[in-house]
């Protein structure tokens, strides 16, 4: 049975992975690559989400893609799935609900 991706959690378990994913999100926002990440970030901020919460929501979408890339049955990275998940924020990707 394959495991589904889990939400980013606070605490010592997975803290390094969470920090790395949040750093990657920051890089995507700063570099405007892909531009849909910055668009999602700006939209979430306009909806009233804090800087940290907006980044964590985007990180949740990125974590799903990382899972799909690393898991043997994950099927690999899918840009369209990632961009689609960003458009749906603040609703989390289905695999995290």
Please state what every model-predicted region is.
Residues 1-97:
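Structure-specific DNA junction-binding interface
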């Amino acid at each position: 049975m394959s495991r589904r991706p889990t939400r980013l959690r606070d605490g010592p378990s997975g803290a390094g992975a969470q920090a790395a994913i949040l750093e990657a999100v920051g890089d995507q926002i700063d570099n405007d690559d892909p531009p849909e990440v910055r668009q999602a970030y700006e939209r979430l901020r306009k909806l009233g989400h804090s800087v940290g919460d907006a980044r964590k929501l985007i990180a949740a979408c990125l974590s799903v893609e990382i899972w799909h890339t690393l898991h043997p049955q994950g099927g690999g990275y899918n840009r369209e799935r990632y961009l689609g998940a960003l458009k749906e924020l603040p609703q989390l990707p289905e695999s995290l609900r």
